[in-house]
Amino acid sequence: QNRPFSGEGIISGWGACRAALPAALQALRRGDVSRAALWGYNTAYFRGQGAKFAAAMAQLPAATEFNAKDTNYLFRHRIIFNGRDFAEMAQTYEVAMGPGKLLKMITFLLWGVLSGQFQASTLKILLRVSGQAGKLKKHYLHFPADPAAFPQWQAEAARLWGEAG
């Protein structure tokens, strides 16, 4: 449950504990600590923090594919790696992408490609991993409330992770 973007795990571990608390209390009160009785924790975790972490994990390997010129362009124009994004990621485990921010990002990326300051191949990587991250997050947001549905969910998750690389 460590944060995919920093490796830190104390705060996110406490977040997981908060997700576990309702299911654990209910199970203890009922005297039933079976897998089924505690399943609510899995549902709460994977539909919340887990979905955000899955999206982040899908995007991380792409950063190793960027060359120095493209990475510097992203930093210089504060497209991806800026202080506000890092602060938001630390607090909410994701970066909100409103229409204004998205338009600015697209404009700078396209300008970078057209002006030769940013590679089209890197833009393709960004688009690919963003799409995969979105698919994974959506899948995790639909984590099954019923343990019997887990094998089917898990098979689809494995397929999506396979596509993500």
Over which residues does each language-model region extend?
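C-terminal auxiliary extensions adjacent to catalytic cores
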Residues: 64-165
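Short, low-complexity, polar/charged sequence segments that are solvent-exposed and flexible
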Residues: 11-14, 60
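Glycine-rich phosphate/pyrophosphate-binding beta-alpha loops
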Residues: 1-11
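C-terminal catalytic subdomain
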Residues: 13-15, 21, 87
